[in-house]
Design a protein with these regions (language model features):
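Sec-dependent N-terminal signal peptides
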Residues: 5-14
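Extracellular carbohydrate-recognition regions
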Residues: 20-41
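Extracellular beta-strand elements of beta-rich domains used
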Residues: 27, 205-209
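Short tryptophan-centered beta-strand motifs in secreted/extracellular beta-sheet-rich domains
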Residues: 27, 94-96, 154-166, 170-172
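Secretory/extracellular carbohydrate-interaction modules
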Residues: 59-136
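Short, aromatic/His-centered strand-loop micro-motif at the edge of beta-sheets
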Residues: 138-160
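Short strand-turn-strand beta-turns centered on an Asx-Gly dipeptide
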Residues: 173-177
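Flexible glycan-contacting loops in extracellular carbohydrate-active proteins
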Residues: 182-205
């Protein structure tokens, strides 16, 4: 009887392992077919080379800003996205190692997710003082949540970001520091990527999808 119980336990462990999914993108190639998008009138680029993804957004130039009546860098964003190998209806984790540039009110970085297309997505974005959860639907800004950030130590340029979903709560971590949680925001799409705002440079070493 004891041997039979051990066999059942071992079978359950194997079944659990078989159901788990772990995919790591190391940017040795464009295996997940990453795509880029910039706000109209603003430039940027994303390049996969030498095992990293480098995303550069140019922000707004002085001439365009003057014509639009905005501050330099205002209302500019650049994204790079793929379709993650995940079922977003189930719990998952996404972990990524990045190097970020200078942050300011008009220089932000973050994670893009629940991405359907350029006008329908969620994002966690932050600077040195504040983190925001933003939502776009049909090219319109439809909601946000903001809160201040208190870094436990001096913020590093090299960081680990982690996005977790348990089915009802979305949690965003920077270097194990939980900087924002939101609840009851249903996920429909597996699109995932990176969000830069203003004049910014983001280098991505790798990203791991766990389910």
């Amino acid at each position: 009887m004891k041997a039979k119980r051990l066999f059942v336990v071992a079978a359950l462990i194997c079944a659990t392992s078989a159901n788990a999914q772990n995919v790591k993108e190391t940017f040795d190639s464009n295996s997940l077919d990453w795509n880029e998008c910039a706000t109209e009138g603003h430039g940027g680029k994303s390049i996969i080379d030498k095992g990293v993804l480098t995303i550069t957004s140019e922000g707004a130039n002085k001439f365009w800003s003057a014509m639009a009546g905005t501050q330099i860098g205002e209302n500019t964003c650049f994204t790079c996205s793929c379709y993650a190998p995940l079922n977003v209806q189930r719990p998952f984790k996404i972990s990524t190692n990045v190097t970020i540039g200078k942050l300011d009110n008009d220089r932000l970085v973050g994670l893009l997710f629940n991405y359907k297309d350029d006008g329908n997505f969620y994002a966690f974005i932050f600077n040195d003082e504040e983190v925001n959860f933003i939502r776009f639907k049909d090219m319109k800004f439809v909601g946000s949540k903001s809160q201040s950030v208190k870094w436990s130590k001096t913020r590093k340029a090299q960081q680990n970001w982690r996005l977790e979903s348990d089915g009802s709560t979305l949690s965003f971590f920077v270097d194990e520091l939980p900087i924002m949680k939101v609840r009851y925001m249903p996920l429909e799409y597996a699109g995932f990527g990176y969000y830069t705002f203003g004049k910014q440079k983001l280098i991505v070493d790798d990203v791991e999808f766990v389910q």
